[in-house]
Amino acid sequence: MVRKSHADETGQRAPDMPYVFFPIARHRLTSGRAAALLVFGLALGTARAEVGELVLGVAPLLSETETRAQFQPLCDYLAAVARLPCRVGTRPNFITYWETVRQGKDFNLILDEAHFTDYRAQKMKFTVLAKIPNTVTYSLIIPRAAKLSDPARLAGRRIATLGIPSMGAAQLNGLFTKPSKQPILLEVDNAAAGFALLRDDKVAAAILPTPLVREEIMRGAPFRVLLSTAPLPHMGFSSAPDIGPELRQRLRQALLDAHKSDAGRAMLARIGLERFDPANATVYAGQGRILKEYWGY
């Protein structure tokens, strides 16, 4: 288990239901017709009362402000499909996000990393609808000028990572398996904070999602990649059990067909994706085991 410190220890090196209304008839209804209308009304009311709004939860890889700005176009697109309001929800860091995940109340749609997607599918009966295409890795990065080629030499030194139980923290644990040769995990709230610590020489390295690392380096950041982890299924989009089958299928199809419509393509461009791919729980099966292996969840 990687030893842990906190981002403020900078000098230490150590280790909602709608009613359905019918106009009052001017003539008497037969009992059969009245019953039919009643059944229809109840069914419609039930269908519409599954959820009062969509709340799209997103893992806190970015800051709360950045996450809401980045994914509101996706929320707006789904709101139009569902004819329900939609808002983006996230948390300031992974430890508070994890508490929200385990309670299972705040988000009824979620775009999340592989291990959390599997956890929800297995433990909370969420349904996987789609995923971001391809796979994703994490990259261990160091300053460009650092004369370091062996990750083992980072033992005893500070490495910035997204907080426990993020995938980044799990990947860092997997890199350093010897109890006597551990780095010091320095938890950060989001990727930008990790980049800042590395740029200011407050950590020797950082392990962060490779797509974000690539963007940062392309913007001129003085970093280089020491290694990248084995690929994982990219982030999955899943729905909570209170999203009924009909709405769930509409949302799934809207995601998978987004690249075929003007509105969908505009949304994808704004969130930086080409498309969503089909996915189900099998894609993520077994990924949640790291939550138990490393942290006992």
Listing of model-derived features with the role each one plays in the protein:
Residues 34-43:
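Bacterial N-terminal signal peptides
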Residues 50-116:
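Extracytoplasmic small-molecule ligand-binding "clamshell" domains
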Residues 51, 56, 61-77, 137-196, ...:
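Bilobed "Venus flytrap"/periplasmic-binding protein-like clamshell domains
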Residues 52-61, 67, 134-142, 218-259, ...:
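Periplasmic-binding protein-like
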Residues 88-100, 184-196, 231-233:
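Short helix-initiation/N-cap motifs at beta->coil->alpha
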Residues 91, 96-153:
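Acidic, polar ligand-binding/catalytic clefts
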Residues 100-103, 154, 197-199, 251:
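Hydrophobic residues within well-ordered alpha-helices
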Residues 111-123, 199-223, 231:
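A ligand-binding cleft/hinge motif common to bilobed small-molecule-binding domains
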